[in-house]
């Protein structure tokens, strides 16, 4: 009888420990994500006067994709005449792995004309490790910047999503297909 009680109590103790470690793991995953208030706070100081529009876009992104576990703040320039190019640089911020410099480049093709410069905040979803951001993220983009404003697109690769939110200055109108390639060093080659 003692053996049965000992085995049963050992089993229950094991179940409790497994449950606690699973709860701790879920808690750590949630602690590595950014709340909408944290994102809007970081973006408001970065973008300045467009914070109400930013709050609306962040709200929409969170309702679609949940809480991001990273975000990028940076600047970029683009130009297009049917085919286009985009170049940018910024910093990837994460709660559990620190900050990391990132550069991005990308070609696009479609009905797209003009040029713009933009401050960019990119929400990063399902980032397993900071180095995982260094790849190509593809998507369809539409933009209508008329002397300023905000725009949002979605790019995806390997179960991850990057949601760029841009506040641009310039004149650009179009819709295109393209990708962004993230690199640890700057490069002129968008391919």
Predicted regions and their residues:
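Positively charged n-region of N-terminal signal peptides that target proteins for export
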Residues: 1-4
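Bacterial N-terminal signal peptides
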Residues: 6-16
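Sec/Tat signal peptide C-region and signal peptidase I cleavage site
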Residues: 17-23
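Small-residue-enriched, tightly packed secondary-structure blocks
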Residues: 24-191
């Amino acid at each position: 009888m003692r053996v049965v009680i000992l085995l049963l109590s050992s089993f229950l103790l094991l179940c409790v420990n497994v449950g606690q470690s699973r709860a701790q793991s879920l808690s750590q995953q949630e602690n590595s994500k950014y709340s909408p208030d944290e994102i809007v706070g970081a973006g408001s100081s970065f973008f300045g006067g467009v914070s109400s529009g930013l709050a609306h876009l962040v709200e929409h992104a969170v309702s679609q994709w949940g809480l991001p576990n990273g975000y990028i703040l940076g600047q970029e320039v683009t130009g297009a005449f049917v085919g286009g190019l985009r170049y940018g640089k910024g910093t990837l911020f994460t709660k559990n792995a620190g900050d990391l410099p990132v550069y991005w480049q990308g070609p696009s093709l479609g009905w797209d004309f003009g040029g713009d410069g933009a401050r960019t905040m990119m929400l990063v979803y399902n980032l397993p490790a900071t180095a995982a951001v260094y790849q190509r993220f593809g998507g369809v983009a539409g933009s209508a910047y008329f002397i300023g404003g905000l725009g949002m697109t979605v790019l995806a690769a390997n179960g991850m999503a990057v949601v760029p939110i841009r506040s641009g200055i310039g004149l650009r109108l179009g819709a295109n297909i393209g990708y962004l390639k993230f690199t640890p060093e700057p490069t002129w080659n968008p391919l």
